[in-house]
Amino acid sequence: MDLNPSTFVLEIVNFLVLVWLLKRFLYQPVSAAIEERRRQIARTVAEARDTQTAAETLRMQYESRLADWESEKRQAREAFKQEIEAERQRALDELEKALDAEREKARVLIERQRRDMESDLERQALRLSRQFASRFLERLAGPEMEAALLRMFGEDLAAMSPEQWQALTRALEEQEHPEAEIASAFPLKPESCAELTEMIEARTGRAVAWRFREDPALICGIRLRAGHRVLAANVGEELKFFADGAENSLGGG
């Protein structure tokens, strides 16, 4: 076909009109749709990233919480274990104290029973020894032994200290009419009685009303009683003194 200027201009105009139409009715809507789609995709990606970040944060929080929970469980188990151990130790300590107390009570009881048994045996031995000594001395007792005890009594009187004589003198002075008693297991000879009474009256400076009597409980020997003062040299009272002293010693132990 022939290309003339007017046709060329017309083609250009048609082309420009077509371009305008395409741009107006096709390119702009498509561009707008593409831009909207791009923005939607960007929003979706941003939301996905936010979701991923939130999920990662939640995951980290969950893992941290799990770690904290495990730590708390370990601490709780350790605390519970320590509490159980402390309670067990406390129970063991209380049991040990109770056992110690029971052992001490048993020891004290056994010791008391042992001491009581020993005391009973010693008392029995003392009673038997006293009975044996009494029977033995009763068989040996007689005027000869009593004469020996009387001499010993006289020697003891002669050897008394001034303080002892003063005590005997006061015992006589406390009486309105001084009296004294001499008891013996066997009858005393008159000269022996006179010797004793003269010594006492001379040393005390007092005239005394004397009584003489026999007392088989003395077994053998003599006893002088002046007021509250008693002087003796006899088997019976010596045995009683020995037995009473031993009993008191056992009772005090």
Swiss-Prot record:
The keyword Cell inner membrane applies. InterPro entries: ATP_synth_b/b'su_bac/chlpt, ATP_synthase_B_chain, ATPase_OSCP/dsu. It comes from the Bacteria. One of its GO terms (cellular component) is plasma membrane. Pfam families: ATP-synt_B, OSCP. It is a single-pass membrane protein. It is found in: Cell inner membrane. Keywords: ATP synthesis, Cell inner membrane, Cell membrane, CF(0), Hydrogen ion transport, Ion transport, Membrane, Transmembrane, Transmembrane helix, Transport. GO terms for molecular function: proton-transporting ATP synthase activity, rotational mechanism; proton-transporting ATPase activity, rotational mechanism. The chain crosses the membrane at residues 9-27. HAMAP family: ATP_synth_b_bprime. F-type ATPases have 2 components, F(1) - the catalytic core - and F(0) - the membrane proton channel. F(1) has five subunits: alpha(3), beta(3), gamma(1), delta(1), epsilon(1). F(0) has three main subunits: a(1), b(2) and c(10-14). The alpha and beta chains form an alternating ring which encloses part of the gamma chain. F(1) is attached to F(0) by a central stalk formed by the gamma and epsilon chains, while a peripheral stalk is formed by the delta and b chains. Belongs to the ATPase B chain family. PANTHER family: ATP SYNTHASE SUBUNIT B', CHLOROPLASTIC. F(1)F(0) ATP synthase produces ATP from ADP in the presence of a proton or sodium gradient. F-type ATPases consist of two structural domains, F(1) containing the extramembraneous catalytic core and F(0) containing the membrane proton channel, linked together by a central stalk and a peripheral stalk. During catalysis, ATP synthesis in the catalytic domain of F(1) is coupled via a rotary mechanism of the central stalk subunits to proton translocation. Component of the F(0) channel, it forms part of the peripheral stalk, linking F(1) to F(0). This is ATP synthase subunit b 2. It comes from Methylococcus capsulatus (strain ATCC 33009 / NCIMB 11132 / Bath). The gene is atpF2.
